[in-house]
Swiss-Prot record:
CDD domains: PBP2_EcHMBS_like (cd13646). The porphobilinogen subunits are added to the dipyrromethane group. PROSITE patterns: PORPHOBILINOGEN_DEAM. It comes from Francisella tularensis subsp. holarctica (strain OSU18). The lineage of its organism: Bacteria, Pseudomonadati, Pseudomonadota, Gammaproteobacteria, Thiotrichales. Keywords: Porphyrin biosynthesis, Transferase. This is Porphobilinogen deaminase.
Amino acid sequence: MKQITIASRESKLALWQTNFVKNRIQSELNIPCEISTMKTQGDIILDQPLNKIGGKALFMKELEVAILSNKADIAVHSLKDVPYQLPQGFCLAGFMPREDPRDAFVSNKYNSIDDLPKGAVVGTSSLRRKAQLLHYRDDLEIRDLRGNIQTRLSKLDNGDYDAIILASAGLIRLELVERITQFIPVEISLPAVGQGIVVIEALERDNDLLEKIQKLNCRESSRVATAERAFNQELKGGCHVAIGAYAELDNNQITLMAMVASSDGKKILKRKMIGDDPTKLGKLLAQEMIALGAYKILES
């Protein structure tokens, strides 16, 4: 293979992730790479909540079109932005090692969620984060917050919010860890499916490329991500519902924690299950939670 072209979004975080993959391909597979950057609809439409304009797939479509039209060979994504169902013909070819999966509390005035005064304004665009925050602190005011990490931090620094919630992984990767005031415990805010994992997307038919990319695959990331995504797929969850799932691997045993909540945080269901087959584990936990009324909670 002469060269691999990688499709990427233009944000600093997207380019960090893409360059991370590029460097691994070049150093470990000895294949030269080039990056092709592009704006996605998710980057352009910033004045509306994601769940109102089409969901997470808006961050991927242009990259997938580039692959289909032979302008790129692979695309690099944050796994938490990847819907549970990919377009026909695409697959997840490689999972990178997971960064810290927790949500980050970022504030210039307060040290933690517990320190926030009644009525404090917290920014997040995630229904999952909003629901869990309101469940923990129903006296907070949650306002929508879109844009890349730098844009969101600027809005906080300008005084638009008392605090904002971001993914710790993105701040760590951009060397902004000093902005994290509190790593939010998973008991308070269970992460999004796949949070902290960078993933490579490719065409299923490209066997030669898939075989090469597979050599970069992190087995632990792949197994925990498969469990989390199987749970999400069984529930048919997207960014229009408050769903969280986080798996940990110990030897060959996977512990999967999951949460569904009403958008106002008043109703919440949390469960945990242990198993060694990630797909089966995710499905079984979802089925258990469906039997306990998960859909009724999500619909409310």
